[in-house]
Amino acid sequence: MFNTFQTTLAVTVAFALALLAPVVAQSLTDRDTNEIAGYALTDAALAKYTKAVHKLQPLMEQLPQDCDQDEGSQSLDGTAARMDGVPGVKAALKAAGMTSREYLLFSWSLFQNGMAAWALEQPGGKLPPGVKMANVNFYRKHEAELKKLGELTKQADCDNR
């Protein structure tokens, strides 16, 4: 089960962590937290996200190397603006049909729902408050595909630098 957790973590936040240093979800505004919780994961968004991960792959070496530096914004919009500040990121995401904000929103929703899927698999596990079972089911349905994406983004994880 821990391997599933690690893969989920890598797939959803590795790129953002590499760009932003550790941005902690609880530091987001209430509006951002609610937006992430209310986001509906879809096949169309996953297709764009998959394309985005592949388009961002060549940019991994351009990412900031200081993972301990805390320059991250405390909002979804601020974090997206920081991503857009990395040369080539905005264009790569646009070519995949996403904005940096959409990429982050999908990523963090995926992370949240992956964690919920993991929690439900634990003895006595219950669906966390505010988490949609439809999103957990989406995550479970696409788990193999997400693991493959996780391998692509693994090198950007601060723990792997």
Q: Where does each model-flagged region fall?
A:
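Bacterial N-terminal signal peptides that target proteins for export
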Residues: 1-10
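Sec/Tat signal peptide C-region and signal peptidase I cleavage site
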Residues: 19-25
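Bacterial N-terminal signal peptides
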Residues: 10-19
